[in-house]
């Protein structure tokens, strides 16, 4: 079994940097991108080769404020206008607010995204000796996600929670072939990172909870734990 892929992507953009004049409170970027993807797959006779070529052209922009200490934000979006990219789009944004709480620094981060994209090429086409599929009728995956994050610097605490909705989720079924779920799938998640330090001893901890609305299509462990205990010290000065 063999397959090959060659991809070339070019992006042309123009940017107005944040602060280029006194009225520019944020940076602004516009761009256009073209991606050419060439795939070679074996045919059913295992001798000849099937060739696939896909073009994607997107236009998009970004609005971002990165300067300053209190408030930062970024929003970026792109939409497909030619060939395989038609009907596809991606929009994502994030915002972080930093403020003092007593003698500590607290950061609140909010993230959101929405996208409508084709499943990966090898989910749509794959040829081998034991598995062979051409799924030309697959629908685009529509995803929306919201996430919030809280960081407390002095306590070395990070708390994160998010929710995601996926329509036409693409997965491998029990026959190890790609399939799309009809309707929507929801995923809830929350995680806590808490680090401790006592002299040269360090203990990093992460607890993650997650829940899928369809465990058959997207099985997820309810709880996962990570712990890392180590010592950190200097062997020599000025080294």
Predicted regions and their residues:
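Exposed, low-structure sequence patches enriched in small/polar residues
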Residues: 1-239
């Amino acid at each position: 079994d063999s397959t090959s892929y060659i991809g070339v992507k070019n992006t042309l953009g123009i940017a107005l940097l944040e602060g280029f004049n006194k009225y520019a409170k944020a940076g602004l970027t516009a761009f256009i991108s073209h991606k050419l993807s060439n795939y070679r797959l074996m045919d059913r006779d295992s001798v000849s080769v099937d060739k696939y070529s896909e073009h994607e052209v997107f236009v998009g922009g970004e609005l971002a404020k990165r300067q300053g200490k209190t408030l930062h934000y970024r929003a970026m979006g792109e939409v497909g206008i030619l060939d395989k990219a038609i009907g596809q789009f991606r929009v994502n944004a994030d915002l972080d607010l930093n403020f003092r709480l007593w003698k500590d620094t607290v950061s609140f981060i909010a993230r959101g995204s929405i996208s409508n994209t084709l499943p990966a090429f090898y989910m749509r086409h794959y040829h081998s000796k034991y598995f062979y599929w051409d799924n030309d009728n697959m629908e685009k995956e529509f995803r929306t996600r919201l996430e919030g994050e809280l960081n407390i610097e002095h306590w070395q605490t990070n708390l994160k929670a998010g929710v995601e909705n996926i329509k036409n989720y693409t997965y491998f079924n029990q026959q190890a072939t790609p399939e799309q779920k009809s309707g929507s799938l929801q995923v809830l998640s929350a995680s806590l990172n808490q680090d401790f330090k006592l002299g040269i001893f360090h203990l990093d901890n992460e607890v993650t909870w997650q829940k899928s609305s369809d465990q058959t299509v997207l099985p997820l462990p309810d709880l996962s734990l990570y712990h890392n205990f180590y010592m950190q010290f200097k062997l020599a000065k000025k080294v």
